[in-house]
Amino acid sequence: MLEKVQGYIIKIVNHNDNSKILTLYTNKLGKITVAANIPEKLSNGNMGIYDLGNAVNVVLYRKTEDEMYKISEISLLKQYTNMHFDYEKLCILNYVLYAINQNFEENFGDLTFMNFLKLYMRFINETKTEIKKMIFLFDYYFMLINGQIEILPYLNELEATFLEELSTQIVLKKELFDFITPNLIKEMNKFKKNKFKFLDINKELFYN
């Protein structure tokens, strides 16, 4: 049984020298755990293909529905290189991947969120933006798709316009994004702590 999917690598566990257990967030199967056999030597075109956050094309196979998917073929769709060389971007990347892994059940998928994630990852990779604003943006949208939040009464008009565009068209516009206020971020952080198991943005992110 073969399945072709696109997805993001959100977690990696080294099983042994030549195999890994990957958690992927995919367009067709949602969040899934798969096994990957790693060649001893990767070709130059595949160097870094198993880095966290990579967007990949994958062909999966399994003999029965009870069996874990295994990777038959994998190719790199998008590698967000800047995130691995900028500390703040790396913090955001790890935060996002941790949040998806912790709060999405196995096989949960949402194509609207997948489209948002694609734009969001590109935005982080290419833009120098205040880290708290980027975390706020992810938190808001994450809660929105999970039905945890309907309206924020303390939004000003510009913020409301930005979030309306975000939720209906999945549009990231820097000129609107920059109007997100520190007070709104503070309130969202309070709300967030009562709803989700996110980590603080600090060095502990890399060692837990």
Predicted regions and their residues:
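Non-catalytic alpha-helical scaffolds and adjoining flexible linkers that form interface surfaces
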Residues: 1-19, 25-29, 34-208
